Amino acid sequence: SPKSKMYQASSSEMFGNSIDEDGYQRETTPLNPVSPYGCAKVYGYNLVRNYRNSYGMFLCNGILFNHESPRRGTNFVTGKVAKEAVKIKLGLTDKLSLGNLHASRDWGHAKDYVEAMWLMLQHDKADDYVCSTGVSHTVKDLVEYVFSKLDLDWRDYVVTDEKYYRPEELEHLKGDSSKIKKILGWEPKYTFETMMDDMINDWLKKLK
């Protein structure tokens, strides 16, 4: 249908370790994925752009940086840290094993990013947009914040384990969302801290 609109979920993993001189990644940053997932996302991204440009279809790419919520699985570091820290607080376990504590990510709340997706589809022109908070935190920052919220010293419980290191690690992801803010008026409502509070409180309710 000529009136149909489609949103394609692209990913910051498409950038790999390609970073602009100012430390950010944006719509014009070269794509250089370092994982099969990132490579597949680049393929989908380019396919959307090709069909939009060749056939005039309303197709949008949302280049989303890491977005979290209480629904996040514990196979991801935010979900894992939130759950295991709460378990430690409740006396259900006494150790948390993690990989690279120095990797940094631009973490935002899924609720904000879903709003961004919706805004893309309301606009009169299809385009590609980076969705991010513009603030990055290391895994160590994440651990320190979550444990401190639970009145715990993370150094008493967290150990690093090489089995959790990735073969080709993404060291730094931080997005520039100037374009979507200017054109669509999008602004994230959650901070890193309020996002993690949401996840901590959810696990406290589930595990108590």
Specify the residue positions occupied by each region the protein language model found.
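Conserved Rossmann-fold NAD(P)-dependent oxidoreductase catalytic core, especially the SDR/UDP-sugar
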Residues: 1-35
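Active-site loop of short-chain dehydrogenase/reductase
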Residues: 1-7, 56-58, 93-95, 126
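NAD(P)-dependent short-chain dehydrogenase/reductase
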Residues: 18-24, 42, 46-121, 134-150
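Amphipathic alpha-helical segment in the mid-to-C-terminal domain
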Residues: 36, 74, 78, 110, ...
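Active-site YXXXK catalytic motif of short-chain dehydrogenase/reductase
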Residues: 37, 41
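C-terminal "lid/loop" region of Rossmann-like NAD(P)-dependent oxidoreductases
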Residues: 96, 100, 127-129, 137-144, ...
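Non-catalytic, hydrophobic alpha-helical segments
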Residues: 113, 117, 131, 142, ...
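Amphipathic terminal alpha-helices
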Residues: 191-208
